[in-house]
Amino acid sequence: MRVSYDELKNEFKRVLLDRQLTEELAEECATAFTDTTQAGAYSHGINRFPRFIQQLEQGDIVPNAIPTKVLSLGSIEQWDAHQAIGNLTAKKMMDRAIELASQHGVGVIALRNANHWMRGGSYGWQAAEKGYIGICWTNALAVMPPWGAKECRIGTNPLIIAVPTTPITMVDMSCSMYSYGMLEVHRLAGRQTFVDAGFDDEGNLTRDPSIVEKNRRLLPMGFWKGSGLSIVLDMIATLLSNGESTVAVTEDKNDEYCVSQVFIAIEVDRLIDGKSKDEKLNRIMDYVKTAERSDPTQAVRLPGHEFTTILSDNQTNGIPVDERVWAKLKTL
């Protein structure tokens, strides 16, 4: 089924107002969730909303909290989110990183005591739309085994890198082959994952999303490489923010909150003139796109370029929503 932007936003806002959020905050939060869903990130938009409400009701999310600056070192700042709403706080932090980059050429914000930011790609895209390179990542609850282990000891720790091309080129990836949100998308669609997603109970690779959701044995992206990347991203976010690590969130909290995040903006126009920038970027993209296709019916993929098409389709034809997810939203 498909629903209109306003219909979806009104449902989000209704639920938020019922939880005593102010009119202004409910409007801002509902808009963020609707924008994410319309952009095609269903797993971190409407599908994630019930989980967001659960954490709101548990007190993990403090809706009226105001993030504060703790430390300033020129182009680097340290902030405390005080468990404010994750996606709204992340947007503010990338805005601040862009402000610093406009002054210093680069801006780095390290945030502690943050909540789940929903679609991390929104903040890289936010920077790239303004002509900046945007980089951000977050640590998370331990929901993935490190390479060589069965037990979950590392986070999926999503990493986003966005480049101001036309259209925007952006990598938005967890350190696992699939996030739990994308496993849910595949399960709801009644399909296997396109590549191996994790291990079954006997230690064999599997593409069955329901098995991996249940046993929590995600496959790290690139095997040991994704495992290693997750670990160092956690270390850096923890150090820069003076916040909680994956182990601290996992062992000291009763759910995923008080995570640590990093937002970086780079003003590339200080380093290269506009004409040269466009020529170099277009040459890279053209070189990639004109490679001989392995499947003649499938275009060579440039990361993030599909979102422009998805957004246009959803704006024209309505936003695709799984009927079961929609029914759940209506009961909240």
Swiss-Prot record:
Name the reaction it catalyses: 3-dehydro-L-gulonate + NAD(+) = 2,3-dioxo-L-gulonate + NADH + H(+); 3-dehydro-L-gulonate + NADP(+) = 2,3-dioxo-L-gulonate + NADPH + H(+)
EC number(s) stated in the UniProt entry for this protein = 1.1.1.130
Function description: Catalyzes the reduction of 2,3-diketo-L-gulonate in the presence of NADH, to form 3-keto-L-gulonate.
Q: Name one Pfam family in it.
A: Ldh_2
Q: Which residues form the active site?
A: H44 (proton donor)
Q: What is its main location?
A: cytoplasm
Family recorded in the similarity comment: Belongs to the LDH2/MDH2 oxidoreductase family. DlgD subfamily.
What UniProt keywords apply to this chain's record, in alphabetical order? Answer: Cytoplasm, NAD, Oxidoreductase
What is the organism of origin for this protein? Haemophilus influenzae (strain ATCC 51907 / DSM 11121 / KW20 / Rd)
Indicate which residues the UniProt annotation says bind NAD(+): I168, T169, M170, V171, D172, M173, S174, W224, K225, G304, H305, E306
Name of the protein described by the UniProt record = 2,3-diketo-L-gulonate reductase
Q: Which domain of life is it from?
A: Bacteria
